[in-house]
UniProtKB/Swiss-Prot annotation:
Its main location: nucleus. WD repeats lie at residues 142-182, 197-237, 270-310, 315-355, 364-404, 419-466. This is WD-40 repeat-containing protein MSI5. It is found in: Nucleus. One of its GO terms (biological process) is regulation of DNA-templated transcription. The lineage of its organism: Eukaryota, Viridiplantae, Streptophyta, Embryophyta, Tracheophyta. Residues 237-252 have a biased composition (Polar residues). Residues 1-44, 236-268 are annotated as: Disordered. SUPFAM superfamilies: WD40 repeat-like (SSF50978). Residues 1-12 have a biased composition (Low complexity). It comes from Arabidopsis thaliana (Mouse-ear cress).
Length: 487
């Protein structure tokens, strides 16, 4: 079963010249180092050669949608979002609704915003140009600068942290922050709390601890910083008036430093270039890891000092963009890189002197990997998204178990989501709805601007055990034959 799913159209994404002012912003935002004119000619020529087949492959993917998915929602965004996260689940009129966090990265004609949306029941129909009726904007927060990253607090998911182009981390109580109307000239919303300590911009690396209200960040100052916001949780998490909005009755203000702030609990140095992503050990607020543009993976233990406890100096062959720690097995760490690969490291095989080899290496993307995340539903499964517009689902348990029908399928790949038409900048597995993913892409280089948000769940016939699926299909086959004979 998995071989047919893995053979889902591996559509190649075209990249046209930008058509909106926001494109220039986004191109620079994705932390890619500039290339010389000679280096940039090859991708351009490849784009032109691939363009003729893109429409056909995308059309083919659309025809397979009813077969490959149990549910699917496509929601067109006026402005791109660089991040997406699931929030708390709500019970409304007998139906289940879950909050979504995303952003609007604008070109300056209107303010940048942090958006809280409600997501309702999903379906299988695809409308490429429409705003889905199942995704409704609930509240808008005018954000001080572009929202590069959103992370929710596991102990209270109505509280989120955001990264922008500044050294500070902004903490928001999304429930008590006032709803704002984003028009040009409107003052910024005031964050409920500021986390200070970086000496340079901290744009992307951000994590919230699963066990305690700790926050982790990395930035251009090459440092990893740890905060404990426990002293402010009661204030920021209460349903009373938001402290960030108490300075002005409407919760508005151009000076985000006017609210309360928290200094770092620890500053950890060891990277030699920008820290691009960080992650907590799922069972400890004192253990965490980081990756950066120095191609290093570093593991830290706050109890033993501010130097790396373990590291891999050449974890990939290029910059590392993303990292995630397995919530089921504390020994496994996942990394993604500009070398187009995803790797899995076992911390039991790492040392403090920079030595360590991956236990798995996955090759299935054609461009830089931007996001990786372990599945909450199965310990061996994870997802990876990349600049090639694909979101791949992998299973470590399937490595080395290719069937004859899947000889061209990358080892370990068992599902490929090809619904986005440009780079998939972020995705998030739902903790409340099994095997459900929200993903976002920005469409500036393919279809001229805006973004796409998709909420989807692959067919359970794909991820369930094959013998179980075959037994069920055999029963269905017998039922069909019985009904046919009676008619």
């Amino acid at each position: 079963m998995e071989s047919e799913a893995a053979a889902t159209v591996q559509a190649t994404r075209p990249r046209r010249a930008p058509r909106t002012p926001v494109t220039a912003i986004l191109t620079d935002k994705r932390r890619r180092k500039p290339k010389s004119n000679n280096e940039s000619q090859l991708p351009f020529l490849l784009q032109q050669s691939q363009k003729a087949t893109v429409d056909d492959t995308y059309s083919q993917w659309k025809t397979l949608l009813p077969i490959l998915y149990d549910s699917f929602v496509n929601h067109t965004l006026v402005w791109p979002s660089l991040s997406c996260r699931w929030g708390p689940q709500l019970e409304q009129a007998g139906s289940k609704t879950q909050r979504l966090y995303l952003s609007e990265q604008t070109n300056g004609s209107v303010p940048n915003t942090l958006v809280i949306a409600n997501c309702e029941t999903v379906n299988r129909q695809l409308n490429e140009k429409a705003h889905s009726p199942f995704v409704k904007k609930y509240k808008t927060i005018i954000h001080p600068g572009e929202v590069n990253r959103i992370r929710e607090l596991p102990q209270n998911s109505k509280i989120v942290a955001t990264h922008t182009d500044s050294p500070d981390i902004l903490i928001w109580n999304t429930e008590t922050q006032p709803d704002r109307y984003a028009v040009l000239g409107a003052p910024d919303s005031r964050p409920d709390l500021l986390l200070i300590g970086h000496q340079d911009d901290a744009e992307f690396a951000l994590a919230m601890c699963p066990t305690e209200p700790f926050v982790l960040s990395g930035g251009k100052d090459k440092s990893v910083i740890l905060w404990n916001i426990q002293d402010h949780i009661t204030m920021a998490g209460s349903d009373s008036k938001s402290p960030g909005s108490s300075f002005k009755q409407t919760g508005e203000g151009s000076d985000k430093t006017g609210g309360p702030s928290v200094g770092p609990r620890g500053i950890y140095n060891g990277h030699k270039d920008t820290v691009e992503d960080v992650a907590f050990c799922p069972s400890s607020a004192q253990e965490f890891c980081s990756v950066g543009d120095d191609s290093c993976l570093m593991l830290w233990d706050a109890r033993t000092g501010t130097s790396p406890a373990m590291k891999v100096e050449k974890a990939h062959d290029a910059d590392l963009h993303c990292v995630d720690w397995n919530p089921h097995d504390n020994n496994l760490i996942l990394t993604g890189s500009a070398d187009n690969t995803v790797r899995v490291f076992d911390r039991r095989n790492l040392t403090s002197n920079g030595v360590g080899s991956p236990v798995y290496k996955f090759e299935g993307h054609r461009a830089a990997v931007l996001c990786v995340q372990w599945s909450p539903d199965k310990s061996s499964v994870f997802g990876s998204s990349a600049e090639d517009g694909l979101l791949n689902i992998w299973d470590c348990d399937r490595v080395g178990k290719k069937s004859e029908r899947a000889t061209k399928t990358p080892d370990g790949l068992f599902f490929q989501h090809a619904g986005h038409r440009d780079k998939v900048v972020d995705f998030h597995w739902s903790l409340l709805n099994p095997w459900t993913i929200v993903s976002v892409s920005d469409n500036c280089e393919s279809i001229g601007g805006g973004g796409t948000l998709q909420i989807w769940r692959m067919s359970d016939l794909i991820y369930r055990p094959e013998d179980e699926v075959l037994t069920e299909l055999e029963k269905f086959k017998s039922h069909v034959f019985t009904c046919t004979s009676k008619s």
